[in-house]
Amino acid sequence: MTSITNGNKKIIYDIGANNGDDVPYYLKKADIVIAVEANPILCEQMQKRFALEIEQQKLVIENCVLTAANEVTSVPFYIHKTKHVLSQFPAPTHKPENYEKVFLPGKTVNQLFYEHGYPYYVKIDIEHYDHVILRSLLNNDIRPKYISGESHSIEVFILLASLGNYDAFKIVNGSSVATKYHNWPISTTTGEEVYSFPYHSAGPFGEDVAGEWVNSESLFRTLLSDGLGWKDIHAKKQDEYMLARRPSVLWRIRYWYYFLRWKISPSQRLKRIRGFLYKASKKVIKG
């Protein structure tokens, strides 16, 4: 895929932009930022907050539900009544009464990137849907230099390491972003500066993230030890030329290698046992 509208400009996609707290940082890192957010109320807030950047054509706000479906015009979206960060595209299974169902315009991954151009960095943070969008993105041969996704599902890491062909990784812990990355040195399009990331923002990406890049095996062992949760997995390809090439047919072997190791790990076995005991106790209580 090549950009049809923005040439070789550096484009960042903020997929799951929420209230736009990541946008100021991304504007410092790119020529254009595409903020994708389904919640229309949050989009209105961003339009007011970043009116100047929108007018300068540095920021585009896409009010749509990003989906992996090929043909879609309108899709249901579930807005949490009190915590907007919990709003989601898949129908909620936990306390659905806390959500308001609305129908919003849908857009596919292909449509989004075809309209705005090839990405330099993609942040994916869509509640319970990161791995679906990531798979669609990689299946369409979209492999930006830098990419990140939230690790509530191990499939995010596995897809990056197999189908994505990425071989260098870092982790950003969401709970510590505001403290760890306060007055943090970052590189921008105009040089180096110090920046403080707000609470509940995604934090830095790429070379701005603390620590050395590690290989897939090292990161996998960290996830086995520390578990998943509120943390973003960041990835890049050490050899950018190889990133442009499609992964070999052996990527499926790599996928199942990590998938099965995760499923049979002691932590996952313990989790399944706890789940079984919890369900059993609920049945006993109900009589």
Where are these regions (language model features)?
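Residue-level signal for well-ordered alpha-helical positions
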Residues: 49, 89-92, 136-137
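Glycine-rich adenosyl-binding loop in Rossmann-like folds that engage adenosine-containing cofactors
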Residues: 67-111, 116, 184-185, 189-200
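SAM cofactor-binding core of SAM-dependent methyltransferases
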Residues: 2-72, 151-153
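Conserved acidic-Pro-Pro-aromatic motif
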Residues: 10, 22, 29-32, 111-283
